[in-house]
């Protein structure tokens, strides 16, 4: 098993190219199951979760080719199975996204109940009740979701009683091939939803309202293939910007999407950073200054993203003043706090908030990554901690960050991946 060894270095400085978004790429790859024509996806990040997804598709009998490092071509006309087994699904929650496409195209699907990061209950009931409203018959048996439909799914008005990105994605894909019009009420508004809708529209789907809380889908009988570039990763972008701010550096992120990061950029400016943006780049300048502590409350897009919460906890640890981070999306998402405390951070957990007394003097220590974004917060802490920090269990990190040690190293960080 690998770990990262990090030593305190100088401020980060330079340019880093942002990868395609994991959270956009995973549902995009599933759109291939809606058509018998080949689909080509570009700007796909090389990540553990992407490898899991392609393995899952191959298990279904789908042909998957990788003509270039960040390109994937999928031909689902060779599909042989509608069963997504426990062995693969247990490692990644997004595997549930095969359910809607398989059911819509094949009329049946058997999908193991999913796994992924251990950051609280993420129930799949919204996926299931939505599909049932479209005419699916579903039962959960021996750890598997077994779904079938006679003929095509039927368009329906579906109100989700809580905002769910995954359920919105699953139902959006299923509705693309349904008979009639589907209206998704209280839909998720994330940029990755818009990206998925744009890809489906390129394939011939009729969708309006993506990016709002009401999405309308007029079902069509068949979809075509696609040639589609994955949206830049706003969370990776935010992570590098926080790392630059914490180290007092100046970093430009290229191949970025500034309009997907409004809430994060606003908080970085509140922390004292100078932010400049172009059409596809963002630059943060914190040279000669120390961050100011900020108050952050996570909420569904377009508010502050929960996936940036851990990184801002680290920022508040070393900032001037007292900062408060309140988590409203997931319970049990402060597992990075005890690890930061091992490094000397003064953080108090109060209900669903992390209160950081700033100006902590962090010391290098062996720490353990507990989930994807928590591991990023520990890496950032290691960049400014005195001594040497060992971040263990970085398989979490590899699920969502492409070559993070190489990218940070290119900005001047002293970081290496070693075998334990």
Swiss-Prot record:
Phosphoenolpyruvate binds at residues 22-23. Transmembrane segments: none annotated. Its main location: cytoplasm. GO terms for cellular component: cytoplasm. UDP-N-acetyl-alpha-D-glucosamine binds at residues 93, 307, 329. One of its GO terms (molecular function) is UDP-N-acetylglucosamine 1-carboxyvinyltransferase activity. The keyword Cell division applies. Keywords: Cell cycle, Cell division, Cell shape, Cell wall biogenesis/degradation, Cytoplasm, Peptidoglycan synthesis, Pyruvate, Transferase. The keyword Acyltransferase does not apply. Pathway: Cell wall biogenesis; peptidoglycan biosynthesis. The modification 2-(S-cysteinyl)pyruvic acid O-phosphothioketal is found at residue 117. It catalyses: phosphoenolpyruvate + UDP-N-acetyl-alpha-D-glucosamine = UDP-N-acetyl-3-O-(1-carboxyvinyl)-alpha-D-glucosamine + phosphate. It is found in: Cytoplasm. SUPFAM superfamilies: EPT/RTPC-like. Its EC number is 2.5.1.7. Pfam families: EPSP_synthase. InterPro entries: Enolpyruvate_Tfrase_dom, Enolpyruvate_Tfrase_sf, MurA_subfamily, RNA3'P_cycl/enolpyr_Trfase_a/b, UDP_GlcNAc_COvinyl_MurA. It comes from the Bacteria. GO terms for biological process: cell division; cell wall organization; peptidoglycan biosynthetic process; regulation of cell shape; UDP-N-acetylgalactosamine biosynthetic process. The active site is at 117 (proton donor). It is an enzyme of class 2 (transferase). Belongs to the EPSP synthase family. MurA subfamily. Cell wall formation. Adds enolpyruvyl to UDP-N-acetylglucosamine. This is UDP-N-acetylglucosamine 1-carboxyvinyltransferase. The gene is murA.
